[in-house]
Amino acid sequence: MLQPELKLRRDKIRSLMVSQGIDAALITCNANLIYTYGCVVSGYLYLPLHSPALLFFKRPNNITGEHSFPIRKPEQIVDILKEKGLPLPTKLMLEGDELPYTEYVRLAGLFPDAEVVNGTPLIRQARSVKTAIEIEMFRRSGMAHAKAYEQIPFAYYPGMTDIEFSIEIERLMRLQGCLGIFRVFGRSMEIFMGSVLTGDNAGYPSPYDFALGGRGLDPALPGGADKTPLKEGQSVM
């Protein structure tokens, strides 16, 4: 990820922090680390309002850089900030809607003199307005999808079930560069790659907050295809 792009994204968050009087953010969830650091790490990005972002990492252990610091536990973050002569925040934001309660309490406890607030809505607001590079990434993704969809009619053969058709579509997507992982927001939300529905299964309700339902293959993931045969004259979603 280009550093100017990361700075632009971080500054979008900072501008919203200013409006709420927040001095710093401590970011650790994967999607937000990708947004602010460019990749997933086991660790924390400390984003102060008026100085460069600092990465405190546990894994991988081969990260280098002026603003990167290896740690074994988050309690070391405060010690490093003090060693560097950096002021501790008076108002800190954490990813309150995403962190487990115990981790939220632990991270908040690192800064006992700070007011700790939920920063998830603020980060989501910053991410909702896409940068030029993000828009270009959408365009490239759309082109890859279009190439895969062009091949879908050729993946069908008579006698297929919905799950077999779904597997073939997934194969086409992977060949066009799909990583095969999908991140979804929400405590009880789960998602898999693609959803092919046909017949009565298309009207089967799902507990998930998605547009499509389906019985699925197992109660452990009640959604999507359920081995319904694809029949002539039936719609396929």
Where in this protein do the model-derived segments appear?
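Short, polar loop motifs at secondary-structure junctions
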Residues: 30-31, 55-62, 98-103
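Terminal domain-start leader segments
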Residues: 1-52, 88, 150, 154
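Short, compositionally biased "basic patch" segments
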Residues: 44-67
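Conserved beta-strand termini and adjacent loop/short-helix elements that scaffold enzyme active sites
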Residues: 27-28, 56-58, 71-74, 95, ...
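Flexible, acidic/His-enriched mid-domain "rim/lid" segments that flank
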Residues: 4-10, 79-204
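Short acidic-hydrophobic, aromatic-tinged amphipathic segments that line or gate anion-handling sites
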Residues: 66-80
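A generic local secondary-structure boundary/capping motif
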Residues: 43, 127, 225-228
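Acidic/histidine-enriched ion/cofactor-binding microenvironments in catalytic or ligand-binding pockets
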Residues: 48, 86-88, 195-237
